[in-house]
């Protein structure tokens, strides 16, 4: 078994000083521009272990939600899990393999050689502007696109209250113009009914809950039946999370048909680790997948399905493409959109909508736009260019 450290999701790796042979992995991380730091495990109790980890993260300038902890110590595993660290890797150096997952390790390895580091991505600040590149022979020219959009942070500004989100000015009109020229799809983490109502445009694809549920332009409904089996478990998890987190000011637990999203944008920063730890523990207890986003941590059915697989499914269900295959363009802002960026493939176009909530993180995108307003402008200009190709 191997595990991958992904610079899109992880800003730093914290190594237990008791680990053997860390040098090769540290070099790989440095080449990928992932920070590294060490902490001493053993002794001092649970609170001291938490303090050692958080101080180590502070030294490298990373928040726990974007840090990996690698340790051979079960107590440090428990401390990392209770502090909301993004990924906790146990290393079995002493034949205590069962103790590490029991204390909350996401995975247990025999050796650090089993750790992989994703390489080759650029950082958001390094990406060329998609509007400036649009239509240039040496830039962004796609005569037969299928265009996919995230909603929050892409077609809509991120707002404190998710219920208040609306498409940015001009976005729906631009989508309508584009849909007259090529296939258009909205892929959102919101419920299907929610996102389709907020956009309100007929004749396009809508995918809710990261693709567990879709409607085609003709209104045909599709859902992932394996995911539907988890609906009662998600309902129970939502109720339990409301009980556990309801006393923390600024936390909102959103129960969706195929997920439970815990929003902490309005919560105190010193409570975020606690919030994440509670959600991760619920996911581990109930056999649910834990994913993260912009100021949100979410439980989903533990099924190998995401926006990238949804994009490929939609492409496969578009009209016959044997004469000239459609080229996917995907626009998104969040870490869950990276799956779709990967899925567009070498012939597709991935466009990141920039923000600073995760710093200047790595991304698989090829181009960037500065805001949802620029997304609307890009969409309108793309529609106009396609109409002239007729």
Swiss-Prot record:
Is Cytoplasm set as a keyword in this record? no
Query: What is annotated as the active site?
Result: 150 (nucleophile)
Q: Which Gene3D superfamilies match?
A: HAD superfamily/HAD-like (3.40.50.1000), Trehalose-6-phosphate phosphatase related protein, domain 2 (3.30.70.1020)
Cofactor(s) essential for the protein: Mg(2+)
Catalyzed reactions = alpha,alpha-trehalose 6-phosphate + H2O = alpha,alpha-trehalose + phosphate
Does the keyword Nucleotide-binding feature in the UniProt annotation?
A: no
**UniProt GO molecular function:** metal ion binding; trehalose-phosphatase activity
State the EC number(s). Answer: 3.1.3.12
Query: At which positions is substrate bound?
Result: 150-152
Stored InterPro entries: HAD-like_sf, HAD-SF_hydro_IIB, HAD_sf, OTSB-like, Trehalose_PPase
> What keywords tag this UniProt record?
Hydrolase, Magnesium, Metal-binding
User: Which pathway does the record list?
Assistant: Glycan biosynthesis; trehalose biosynthesis
Residues noted as binding Mg(2+) in the record, renumbered to the chain: 150, 152, 333
Biological process (GO) annotations held by this record are:
trehalose biosynthetic process
The protein's role, per its UniProt record: Removes the phosphate from trehalose 6-phosphate to produce free trehalose.
- What is the protein's name according to its record? Trehalose-phosphate phosphatase
